[in-house]
Amino acid sequence: MNHSFFQPEKQYGEDLPIFDQEWEAIAFYYDYRQSQIEELNELCQFFNISLTYTRESLEELENLYFQSIQELLLADWNLPIEEFEKMISVYLIDCVIARHEDAEWVVKPYPYKDGAYTLGFRRHRKSWHTMNACDGLYLRPKEDRPLLSLFDSLVRS
């Protein structure tokens, strides 16, 4: 029996970029975060949303997210919802970091694949690593305010 199907940690590692040195991973993920915010800012400017790193700006972004799904707003931008979620994810973590002096972005080696590194953020003694904290927000009802709920949870943790 092939047990590789039951090893999600190895499957996840297959999608991670590989680096020879840790500093290369740090530089890569820094550039990644910057480009995500730049693209999100451009999109938000078009829809008259200011990225102020506040809960209110997240609320506006969440409204745009659900509106874009209902009205296919991102089709004109040729932007898949998963890519939009990744942009929102970086911004979400930036918003949490802006509220807490002890929160920061971190890059760590991925233990299941040589040379692979993950992007995450750390607060207190906890760290959380994901490229898309907002994956599948559309699966939750808009009325539940999934993005704001996630933000509130991260701010409290």
Curated annotation (Swiss-Prot):
Coiled coil: 36-63
Keyword Coiled coil belongs to the record: yes
Source organism phylogeny: Bacteria, Bacillati, Bacillota, Bacilli, Bacillales
Designated name of the protein: Uncharacterized protein YwmA
Keyword annotations: Coiled coil
Species of provenance: Bacillus subtilis (strain 168)
